[in-house]
Curated annotation (Swiss-Prot):
Keyword Lipid metabolism: no
One BP term from GO: base-excision repair
Catalytic activity as recorded in UniProt: Hydrolysis of DNA containing ring-opened 7-methylguanine residues, releasing 2,6-diamino-4-hydroxy-5-(N-methyl)formamidopyrimidine; 2'-deoxyribonucleotide-(2'-deoxyribose 5'-phosphate)-2'-deoxyribonucleotide-DNA = a 3'-end 2'-deoxyribonucleotide-(2,3-dehydro-2,3-deoxyribose 5'-phosphate)-DNA + a 5'-end 5'-phospho-2'-deoxyribonucleoside-DNA + H(+)
Family, similarity comment: Belongs to the FPG family.
Active site (UniProt): 2 (schiff-base intermediate with dna), 3 (proton donor), 58 (proton donor), 285 (proton donor)
Full protein name: Formamidopyrimidine-DNA glycosylase
Keywords: DNA damage, DNA repair, DNA-binding, Glycosidase, Hydrolase, Lyase, Metal-binding, Multifunctional enzyme, Zinc, Zinc-finger
Zinc finger (FPG-type): 259-295
CDD domains listed in its UniProt record: EcFpg-like_N
EC number annotated for this UniProt entry: 3.2.2.23, 4.2.99.18
Function summary: Involved in base excision repair of DNA damaged by oxidation or by mutagenic agents. Acts as a DNA glycosylase that recognizes and removes damaged bases. Has a preference for oxidized purines, such as 7,8-dihydro-8-oxoguanine (8-oxoG). Has AP (apurinic/apyrimidinic) lyase activity and introduces nicks in the DNA strand. Cleaves the DNA backbone by beta-delta elimination to generate a single-strand break at the site of the removed base with both 3'- and 5'-phosphates.
Organism: Methylorubrum extorquens (strain CM4 / NCIMB 13688)
Binding site for DNA: 106, 125, 168
Cofactor binding: number and manner: Binds 1 zinc ion per subunit.
């Protein structure tokens, strides 16, 4: 599933074609994706102008002049194909699926804009979805009401992290993936941020808060590394694993900078460390970490 940097890359690729443009025609090639389309979906979109294309965690939101916002979630395999009248692609931010996964038979939604651009949503697995809600109700709608803080926002700092994690015995990695606390983090970038911070993924999350609730020293380090990893990944155009590449056909490059993710048996890249990358399973997901410099304290 695409994580925050990939979704942000997609947003940046879609914005030049969509923002300020009027939706001329919407073609639905099936009645549903993961969920059924909203009532009169195409009709409510046609004739509207996109005022802004934003991101909330792993969601995209297109704010329309009708007072509604289009919510887009890419699921596991969703991608957008953006084409200009001359047939060229916009960049950066699209999904690339190997073989038949990216074929036209999986083109489910086609949005034609009055400026001549066409945006096609392709989703082989159909785990993505689209919804329409009143813009004024975005933060309280069912998709966003329980979401936590944005990890790249100024709101996420060491004191807030300490307050969120205080007295929690939940493993640190699981707490970071809890979208009710911090919205937008995923498996790849949590593994990378924990390694950079020298924190074991199974450490109780409450260890980042002192008994009085103030942040432990490592809380500041972790916040800094979360922001650094995400910022670097966005700048690199995301990470290409199996499903992701940029809309100009180039793949995202951050995977070349992975320190631990999917690198079992490789030497730890931390200067002076002689350890190797190991793997454990937490919550049904693979966790990658250095067995030497990310040590779980003995209690």
């Amino acid at each position: 599933m695409p994580e925050l940097p990939e979704v942000e890359t997609v947003r940046r690729g879609l914005a030049p074609a969509m923002v300020g443009a009027r939706v001329a025609r919407v073609t639905l090639r099936r009645p549903n994706l993961r969920f059924p389309f909203p009532e009169r979906f195409a009709e409510r979109l046609e004739g509207t102008t996109v005022l802004e294309l934003a991101r909330r965690a792993k969601y995209l939101t297109a704010h329309l002049d009708s007072g509604e916002s289009l919510i887009l979630h890419l699921g596991m395999s969703g991608r957008f194909d953006v084409r200009l009248p001359d047939g060229s692609n916009l960049s950066p931010g699209d999904f690339y699926l190997e073989g038949a996964l990216g074929t036209p038979k999986h083109d489910h939604v086609v949005m034609a804009f009055a400026n001549g651009a066409t945006v096609t949503y392709n989703d082989a697995r159909r785990f993505g979805f689209m919804d329409l809600v009143a813009t004024r109700d975005l933060e309280t709608c069912r998709h966003f009401a329980s979401m936590g803080v944005e990890p790249l926002s100024d709101a996420l700092d060491a004191p807030l992290l300490a307050r969120l994690f205080a007295r929690k015995i939940t493993p640190l990695k699981a707490a970071l993936l809890d979208q009710r606390l911090i919205a937008g983090l995923g498996n790849i970038y949590v593994c990378e941020a924990l390694h950079r911070s020298g924190l074991h993924p199974a450490l109780p999350a409450g260890a980042l808060a002192k008994p009085d609730g103030s942040p432990a020293p490592k809380a500041k380090t972790l916040v800094k590394e979360i922001k650094a990893v995400l910022t670097e990944a966005v700048a690199a155009g995301g990470s290409t694993l199996r499903d992701y590449a940029r809309p100009d056909g180039e793949r995202g490059a951050f995977q070349h900078g992975f320190r631990v993710y999917d690198r079992v048996g490789h030497a730890c890249p931390t200067k002076g460390c002689t350890g190797r990358v190991g793997r454990i399973v937490q919550g049904g997901r693979s966790t990658f970490f250095c067995e030497t410099c990310q040590v779980l304290p003995v209690r």
